[in-house]
Amino acid sequence: MVMRMYDIVIIGAGPAGLFAAYELITNNPKLKVAILDKGKLAEERICPMSKDKNCYNCNPCNILSGYGGAGTFSDGKLNFTPKIGKSDLMKYMDENEANNLIDETEEVFNHFGMDSKSYPTNMKQALEIKRKVAITGAKLMIIKQKHLGSDKLPIYIHNITEELIKNKVEVRENCDVLDIISKDKNSHQIITKDEKILTKYVIVAPGRTGAKWVQELADKYQIPYTSKSIEIGVRVEVRKEILEDITNVIYDPTIFIKTDTYGDEIRTFCTNPGGFVAKEKYNEYICVNGHALKDIKSNNSNFVFISKVTLTQPVTNTRAYG
């Protein structure tokens, strides 16, 4: 059996994988690139829970796996900032370079029609809200934001995927990668359930569902790694009008609060004006999430109070906890 040969194979078709393929093929159209994902194309990812509220333990899960990644059914918030929550681009580059990358990313989003009204809608009002928050001892972070909508994201992911196909990127779905055998720096063999694939380079970006597998690969090849902190929170739902004075100006306000008892820092996260609270099952765990559609609104809004937890010895591996 003749093995397929590529210049670059990308494992995982979430935002990292899709953007990597787009950048590679845009800068060098002659490259032979393939994307492998164990899930389905975005337009084929249908969760049975959306119809009868029952989880059938699909393998792989259509919510977590497939083109677009685990965020395909989120509400599509874009936060144009180099640092928020656990994410901090300035660990890897200076602030100017990070902001330039953010501008380039926004241009790609706009190229695919992923554009909407920018927040804050009124900077003067936003600064006044920030002042009022500061009086309470909390801190409001003002950043540029856009909201795309849960109902629109699969369409956008489909459009990105179609452009990659048009530019000769090989798009593979239902392709579960089991192992990578690295012979040397420029020769790798990818083992899937059905075949072996040869490639000069590999980009490993399997996302949330692939975290355990990546850790196993790192152990196999003695690649050092550290575990990031996890964030644990509760989702709160209120009548929409209670938050409108803020959310009409700042769509997803990030407010940092120091707790009185232990001095822990918590923050608001993932605000969904006129949104919906949804039950989600992650393997044996049942959680709640929130999202907001572009065209259909509820009478409620929801948000999360979230706290960062960093584990210490002897239990430092946060992967098993989220």
Where are the predicted features?
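Dinucleotide-binding Rossmann-like beta1-alpha1 core, especially the glycine-rich loop
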Residues: G66-Y119
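Residues forming the flavin
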Residues: V2-P82, K124-G322
